[in-house]
Amino acid sequence: VNERLKANALSIIQANDLDETKDTLTVKCEVISADRKRLTAVYKGDRMSDGAAYPVSVFYTNTMDLNQVRDLGLSDFTDGYTMAGYVLSDDVEFLGVTQEQKEAFLKYRDSLDMDILTEVFNGADFPLASENAWPESFSYESHGTICFSVPVPHALGDYVIVTFNPSTK
């Protein structure tokens, strides 16, 4: 289990083709839940590529089924199509965004459609499709609420976290 968690945590380096001698990656891990069945780690930070004008905000998660030693992802809790519809709906809710950030995202959202978002969410989370493919979205479940990232332009913060509570929808 520990080796799998470590490999997933460090996979951002190869998947984003980071040069450890020139690029900078700063990530903090928070274990948001852990019990005998499941462990969920949330990683947040920044990466700065050599020669880049600014750092990019990084968000990724790893939820592991400890009994089966397998990664759990968005598809274990819901489906990409449903979440795409939710993100495009008037009911969408966010985690940790200001009113200004919410308004900016809602304007940006007009450039998105069901197909784009469904593809993003269907490819969310670990395991990676290949060692050089990094998902555009990561998710976790906390107390019945599904939290997942939506990629946005750098000017909007690189990602927003959307929350979905199936029991209230």
Regions found by a protein language model. Name each.
Residues 1-169:
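Compositionally biased intrinsically disordered regions enriched in Thr/Gly
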